[in-house]
Amino acid sequence: MGLEKVLNTIKSLKTTEKVFFISILFSSFVPVYLSFYLIPQTLFSMGVGITTLILIIIYFYYFASDESKWLQRETFMLILVFILIFHLPSLYFGSSRVSHSLPLKDNQIIKGDKFFLGWIFPLGQLSLYLDKNNTVGPHTKLGMIINSFLQIFYSLYYIVPYIFIYILCYANCIRETVYRYNNNGNKSKKYDKHWSELFFILSVYTITYSLVLTINTIIPASSPRLYIQNKYNHQLNLYGISKFFNKICKDNGSANSFPSGHVAETLSIAIALFGMKRYINGTIALIISFLITSATLVLRYHYFCDVLCGILISIFAFIIPYYIAFKKERFEFEKNDNLNINDDDLEKIPYMPALNGEDTEEDD
């Protein structure tokens, strides 16, 4: 693929596609820069660089493909999303390595919690209040049931965003494949709209993930369960599989508390779905995000400021691609849908002979 062909491909991209491409570059090179700046000679950049190169090659190969090879394009898009699923978590492990070597900022974050919620909860921590509660505390049966339920949803964070994204991508591919198979290879009217939605939600999620990890690296913090563990009188007691999930999530070397990726990344998916007018999916994602957010506070994984910053990041990451690209493209798609009138719709329009140049009975 020559340079001229690559440049022509970039020029032909729609705005949502360009935003997605930029978000991929941002997700890779900002953490790499921070790694080199804070800890020289880190090997983290090598893995991210290779992953990014693979992403870019597939990305350009997908868009440079012949339009007639639509099945090839659909297949490569699935591969692109699949690699992205592995690409983003790799950034987490790299940024964690950087954060662990820096002084923690938990004390400053607790001051922020005390400012916002100190008049309600001890040190501004909901988990400390619950620890002393004899009704829903971690030492009560009701508290154990609630905590076990929340632990399951907390663990779902690691798969839920990718499930929503991949199902959306996979559904588009299947829908388009079936349509083209039944229509001599012609693309459907909603083909461009569906892929615009996919690039939009991918951009929102990638930007969110990148911002979270960047701030994680700049402002490292552990978590309430580690930094103020001596303040708690009771351990978290869980039932069944929740105990197993809690053991996996428990990391004594955590330094990525601020901001909360659990909150930011799940909420960004919910907001993006609402922006796409997929209200049912958006509501489901919002409920899951709310439960995950509750789990982060109740189970001592995050401070309130972690949650607050995560919410702000998700909103910011939504605004950028939505107002720069997706809103305008969605308006064009909706306008075209309103202008498209098929034969069945024409038959429903009342017959008005005078407008068709025919004489009416009154004229006779």
Segments the model singles out, each with a brief description of its role:
Residues 344-364:
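Intrinsically disordered, low-complexity cytosolic terminal tails
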Residues 88-112, 206-235:
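Aromatic-rich transmembrane-lumenal/periplasmic boundary elements in polytopic membrane proteins
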Residues 223, 257, 292-317:
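Interfacial helix-loop-helix junctions of multi-pass membrane proteins
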Residues 26-33, 84-90, 209-214, 289-298:
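Aromatic-anchored segments of alpha-helical transmembrane domains
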Residues 3-51, 69-163, 182, 186:
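N-terminal transmembrane-helix/juxtamembrane module of multi-pass inner/ER membrane proteins
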Residues 163-171, 263-281, 285, 312-321:
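Membrane-interfacial alpha-helical segments at the cytosolic side of multi-pass membrane proteins
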